[in-house]
Amino acid sequence: MTVQSIMFQGTASDAGKSWLAAAVCRILANRGQKVAPFKSQNMALNSFITEKGDEMGRAQVFQAEAAKVKPDVRMNPILLKPSTDKDSQVIVMGKVLKNMDAVSYYQFKRELIPQIMMAYNTLADENDVIVLEGAGSPAEINLNENDIVNMGMARMADAPVILVADIDKGGVFASIYGTIKLMPREDQQRIKGIIINKFRGDKSLLESGNKMIEKLTGIPVIGVLPMSSIDIDEEDSVSLIRKPRQKDTQKDLDVAVIDLDKISNFTDIHSLEIQPDVSVRYVLTAEELGTPDLLIIPGSKNTNADLVALRKNGIAEGILRAHKDGSMIVGICGGYQILGQMLYDPTGIESPIKEQKGLGLLDTETTFNEKKTTTQAVAKRNNYILKGYEIHMGTTKRGLNSTPFSTIQETNGQPENREDGAVSTDGTVIGTYLHGIFDNPYWTRHLLNQLRVAKGMAPLVDTTVSISGYKDQQYEKLAQLFAQNVDMDKFNQILQDSTKE
């Protein structure tokens, strides 16, 4: 069986590698080819749980959706989830290996090459094309010796590379030239094309620069993509900088999301952002908080540390004040834990803080332990069937002054019967371990209509928004954007030249 490969690397983080890889996945899938995305090592706090209960990075999930296939942990065999500025949880083939500091991991990571290549080779055996993505920049010369994700991975897969450069930040030609010239000659020769991304204005103004960079590097500029408002899941928390900080006064409902320092799985909020009557804003300070209709405390990779920070910056007090003044509150995973009475970490799983008081809005107590729960789950709340996934270390017990949020009926395809989450006695505070809770359109609209009625507004009917249908539309737009702004003859030739038996 023959297989083709193409790899996107960037001059910096957030250059657009993930998006362009997704675009190519959709283009090739639309041609009828079997396509799989691949990123050997991903560092992200946004993760996903597969049908088999394996944890993987979110970017390869939306790339798999673009490729019209189910997410498979082989698409992202190594996932690093930072827990502090120096330490990360190392996840190999979907399961926790251990926590490691940066120096230890740098010395260790080449031992992971057999697992990486097993994942890559088995995907290559099953697909027509593998679309690879690098991480950050391939020109980090202090890290290149043990590289397993950029040119190191390109060499292992013998994949041609497209270099993606973000012009919106300025200095695009310097970043292209510097990135290429810092590479060994062998790696420079692997780059077959350059794409300039996020351009605003008249492309003709770039032509002289494109010709000059082609002459300086010997590599053709095969495309210039415009800045786009296409709405695809973001993986890097740097993308939160672009999120709204103020309410859209044209929308009926004000939803405020606490922008935690160690925020994770902020993709949970995406389904609310596309609702016709909802304005979503991200809150960094107590002054910004106000009294939203719905206040969301999202997931956290270090719940104890984020709770300490919330108290220091005054947001904890602001949350309590907002609730007193009428805001409904939903906590997801770490946010659920924060809403409780107490958090215990006797063995230092998350942090040196052995115990601390929560915000006290739910009658729950959480104890962190080494066992990590990773499941795809199906739950029921009242008459609503809810689908989501769990990623947490520790257990939460409810007291007498709260009721379960839902009953888990299935995990990883197997029957289950256990309770999840908690709801305050007055129904104004909800906590759940289910990520993706707002991706359930009927329950979400029910919740939003409750908020509307509380404000004296009529509920919206026949306005449920399917996140899956919405995403599919965005992938088609992304594929079209790529095809219209890239020299597809040159791109197809690069892909064709990569063919291997």
From Swiss-Prot:
<comment type="function">
    <text>Catalyzes amidations at positions B, D, E, and G on adenosylcobyrinic A,C-diamide. NH(2) groups are provided by glutamine, and one molecule of ATP is hydrogenolyzed for each amidation.</text>
</comment>
<dbReference type="InterPro" id="IPR027417">
    <property type="entry name" value="P-loop_NTPase"/>
</dbReference>
<dbReference type="InterPro" id="IPR033949">
    <property type="entry name" value="CobQ_GATase1"/>
</dbReference>
<dbReference type="InterPro" id="IPR029062">
    <property type="entry name" value="Class_I_gatase-like"/>
</dbReference>
<keyword id="KW-0169">Cobalamin biosynthesis</keyword>
<dbReference type="InterPro" id="IPR011698">
    <property type="entry name" value="GATase_3"/>
</dbReference>
<protein>
    <recommendedName>
        <fullName>Cobyric acid synthase</fullName>
    </recommendedName>
</protein>
<feature type="active site">
    <location>
        <position position="435"/>
    </location>
</feature>
<keyword id="KW-0315">Glutamine amidotransferase</keyword>
<feature type="active site" description="Nucleophile">
    <location>
        <position position="333"/>
    </location>
</feature>
<dbReference type="GO" id="GO:0015420">
    <property type="term" value="F:ABC-type vitamin B12 transporter activity"/>
</dbReference>
<dbReference type="Pfam" id="PF01656">
    <property type="entry name" value="CbiA"/>
</dbReference>
<dbReference type="InterPro" id="IPR002586">
    <property type="entry name" value="CobQ/CobB/MinD/ParA_Nub-bd_dom"/>
</dbReference>
<feature type="domain" description="GATase cobBQ-type">
    <location>
        <begin position="252"/>
        <end position="443"/>
    </location>
</feature>
<comment type="similarity">
    <text>Belongs to the CobB/CobQ family. CobQ subfamily.</text>
</comment>
<dbReference type="GO" id="GO:0009236">
    <property type="term" value="P:cobalamin biosynthetic process"/>
</dbReference>
<dbReference type="InterPro" id="IPR047045">
    <property type="entry name" value="CobQ_N"/>
</dbReference>
<comment type="pathway">
    <text>Cofactor biosynthesis; adenosylcobalamin biosynthesis.</text>
</comment>
<dbReference type="Pfam" id="PF07685">
    <property type="entry name" value="GATase_3"/>
</dbReference>
<dbReference type="GO" id="GO:0003824">
    <property type="term" value="F:catalytic activity"/>
</dbReference>
<dbReference type="InterPro" id="IPR004459">
    <property type="entry name" value="CobQ_synth"/>
</dbReference>
